[in-house]
Amino acid sequence: MRAVDIIIKKRDKQELSKEEISFLVKNFTTGEIPDYQISAWAMAVLLNGMSHQEITNLTMAMAASGDQLDLSEFGGLVVDKHSTGGVGDKTTLVVAPIVAACGLPVGKMSGRGLGFSGGTIDKLESIPGFKSDLSTEEFISKLREHGIVLTGQSLDLAPADGKLYALRDVTGTVQSIPLIASSVMSKKIASGADAIALDVKVGRGAFMRNLEEANELAEVMVAIGKLSGRRVIAVLSQMDQPLGVAVGNALEMKEAIEMLNGSGPDDFHVHCIDLSAYMLILGKKAADLESGRKMAQEALDNGSALKKFKELIQSQHGDVSVIEQPELLPAAQLVIPITADSAGWVKVVDAQAVGESSVEIGAGRAKKGDIIDQAVGIMVRVKVGDKIKAGQTLFDVHVNDRKAFETVFQKLKTSVQISEEPVEPPPYFWGVIGL
């Protein structure tokens, strides 16, 4: 078998066999196949696409290229969640303890933030002492003991995907749906979950800008789930404006703690309850969306989700006192408001501009390895559809020096557009696939 023949086959729009895909992935991972050949193949995939079976074979080959977690002792019950990334998306911090409090084990490996999309692990590390780099043995023992574990991707999961992603980044092949879907699902399958809830974000602050592309990606990932024997649901959710109010690590942690205490922004509340419900359906704890929502809300109302969150933080050596006293979390020295020049109805709150501004003030990374400031961030005080007055606060910017504020002032000011006519708020969700 030769790599060049496989490239020609895909160039000519033919379907690749399981053996051909395995050959490519295995030999690319070991360095036998050079970057330039895989780059040519990736471009052929971008231009000509892949069948669902091909994408599944690619996913499984990439999952098998490194460590694979065996969670079979949990009897097919472990459920995982993945978000394609957004601005202010602190959902995992609330959803994981809700679902675990309902008796369903949640074992999740999360990433760090890159670009304007925040990472769950960065938010958890705003809690002093929290240990996010667990070994396989620690991951499984904590899941066994507490029914919940959230860790960084310290294992060598799907190394073929890491190598391929680095190439896609510099060869114009990032936007290929088969390659995006196999990238996400290979890591999820390698991390051992039986059921996966996918939160596919759509809009200005998301990787997928339009509903058509997001829908296609969701359908492909659900198909991979079916063909690989996993239960998968994909929820399409709105990301034109940030989720909730807080953007920035300690600020988002504070908002998640508020939600677990029964308060918090409406859009974030709906998002957490619905995603929890879908996870409970996947884990066969709830028969339908309504009963799943009821179970999730009860876990918030009776305090069991908050208790489970404390258990998680304690089990991973974090300082639990910050959950009782969120004011102990890192805080910025300055809080500077940005106000509206005119009255009217909020037409746009540009999630990308808010996310990029948060990176510029130090809350996120422009490139891998950048050091982040846990304390800084942005509180978004308006939502699309709100009626506002001139002089009303649009944002509270949390910074440690005024210069940082000045670099983002104009971008944030223009990220909100105000209409003279009433504006209809957007739906929280655009649909669900796989249910």
Where are these regions (language model features)?
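A glycine-rich helix N-cap at a beta->alpha junction
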Residues: 123-149, 219-225, 229
